[in-house]
């Protein structure tokens, strides 16, 4: 069976991508990164998802990006309730580049030619490393900068959700049997995985379920506006 490395954060998008990779016949090696994120319950969710989906392997790698800083997700910077203009303070400098690089390294070691990630360029917060151009550029890098690439193996970086709305992602998850109750998306999630209901991630998630007409299993400490209007 062909192998793939899948970046599994513990959020809903990465859970759906993991299920998609499995449905395509890949033996999934899930990779989660402990980068110093304040919402550590997301990693607990990744462990649960990997176990329930019965992935072939699950590795958690420590890369402490707090030493670099520059993000509200790692530093003592207030996480805003609403997104503003430009790139938000929740952007983590070079995060997706670093994570994909680690996935690339593991893929080369285990003999996998495919990497999956859950980046999205439709209903997203404006992160530059979620754009299709970035995924295309990284795939080019992967084939230029690896032993297997130079020796002729074509490496592929898959982002199957990049052109889907959050509602469409919810439908994909339902189609593939994903238990969204296992996932954590909130930037301010508490240690038990309860979501704040106010941050941009919570609002996007809640709106996705509402637009999809699917019950939202998220445990919110405060109901997002999109749910209060229903």
From Swiss-Prot:
GO biological process: queuosine biosynthetic process
Catalytic activity annotation: 7-carboxy-7-deazaguanine + NH4(+) + ATP = 7-cyano-7-deazaguanine + ADP + phosphate + H2O + H(+)
Family: Belongs to the QueC family.
Binding sites annotated in the UniProt record for Zn(2+): 186, 196, 199, 202
Lineage: superkingdom: Bacteria
Protein name per its UniProtKB record: 7-cyano-7-deazaguanine synthase
Claim: Zinc is one of the keywords in the record: yes
Cross-referenced HAMAP family: QueC (MF_01633)
SUPFAM superfamilies linked to this entry: Adenine nucleotide alpha hydrolases-like
Note on cofactor: Binds 1 zinc ion per subunit.
Binding site for ATP: 8-18
Job description of the protein: Catalyzes the ATP-dependent conversion of 7-carboxy-7-deazaguanine (CDG) to 7-cyano-7-deazaguanine (preQ(0)).
GO MF annotation: an example: ATP binding
Cofactor field: Zn(2+)
CDD domains linked to this entry: QueC-like (cd01995)
Coiled-coil segments on the chain, per record: none
Keywords: ATP-binding, Ligase, Metal-binding, Nucleotide-binding, Queuosine biosynthesis, Zinc
InterPro entries: QueC, Rossmann-like_a/b/a_fold
EC number, UniProt record: 6.3.4.20
Pathway info: Purine metabolism; 7-cyano-7-deazaguanine biosynthesis
Broad enzyme group: ligase
Organism of origin: Xylella fastidiosa (strain 9a5c)
């Amino acid at each position: 069976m062909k192998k793939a490395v899948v970046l599994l954060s513990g959020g809903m998008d990465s859970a759906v991508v993991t299920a998609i990779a499995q449905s395509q016949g890949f033996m999934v090696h899930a990779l989660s990164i402990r980068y110093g994120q304040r919402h550590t319950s997301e990693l607990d969710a990744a462990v649960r998802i990997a176990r329930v989906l019965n992935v072939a392997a699950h590795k958690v790698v420590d890369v402490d990006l707090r030493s670099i800083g520059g993000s509200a997700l790692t530093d003592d910077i207030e996480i805003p309730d609403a997104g503003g203009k430009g790139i938000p303070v929740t952007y983590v400098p070079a995060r997706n580049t670093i994570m994909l690089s680690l996935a690339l390294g593991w893929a080369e070691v285990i003999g996998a030619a495919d990497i999956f990630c859950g980046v999205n360029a439709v209903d997203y917060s404006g992160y530059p490393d979620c754009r299709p151009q970035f995924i295309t550029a990284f795939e080019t890098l992967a084939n230029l900068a690896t032993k297997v690439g130079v020796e002729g193996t074509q490496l592929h970086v898959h982002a199957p959700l990049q052109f889907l709305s959050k509602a469409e992602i919810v439908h994909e998850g339902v189609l593939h049997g994903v238990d969204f109750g296992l996932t954590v998306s909130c930037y301010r999630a508490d240690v038990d995985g309860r979501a704040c209901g106010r941050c941009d991630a919570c609002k996007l998630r809640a709106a996705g379920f509402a637009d999809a007409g699917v019950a939202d299993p998220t445990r919110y400490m405060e109901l997002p506006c999109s749910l209060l209007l229903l």
